[in-house]
Amino acid sequence: MQTAPDPKDYVALPPPKYGGPTAETSLTTEPSCKDEARIGQKNSLTRVWGQTGSRPVAPKDLGFASAYLFGAVCPSAGKAAALIMPICNTAAMNHHLSEISSQVAADAHAVVILDGASWHNSRGLVAPSNITLLALPPYSPELNPVERIWHYLRSHWLANSVFRSLADIMDACEMAWSRFATNDGLVRSLCAVAWAPASSAL
């Protein structure tokens, strides 16, 4: 049986870019994780139920419009923060970090696990003082619980769909994330890990 990954084994992003608390600071830690997903008109297909002998039909769009869903969760605090953006870059990342920061308790400091995407460690990235970013090892998306969220959202609410416009895509993303974030049991089952157990309030 594999043991859960320990955040202490992760590589920290360059400290000059991120102003975290000093060693003497006594704050509650909110272990969190974040990621981004592209949702667009070139949508994914998933399996569906059908009668024996039938061949279910799934629509497929040839358009190129897409949006990006920025998502973060803190299972131990029972929090989820998301933004839907038309582009994925450093500016969008800064907006999402601000959203995460606004949900961190006054007596807490968030440690956010994330992958090595270029906008996660660019020079223009400004992390709020109540957030420290920890980078996952390269090519290890399976270590990020948020990846499970994207798979669930696509397979249950976003796949096998045709979106007429960017506005439709963003509306669908908002609907899917809201259904996930307001389902306490789903947040617990998808995102809780040994280093970030589900809150007893969930």
Where in the sequence are the language-model features?
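Short functional hotspots at interaction and active-site rims
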Residues: 1-202
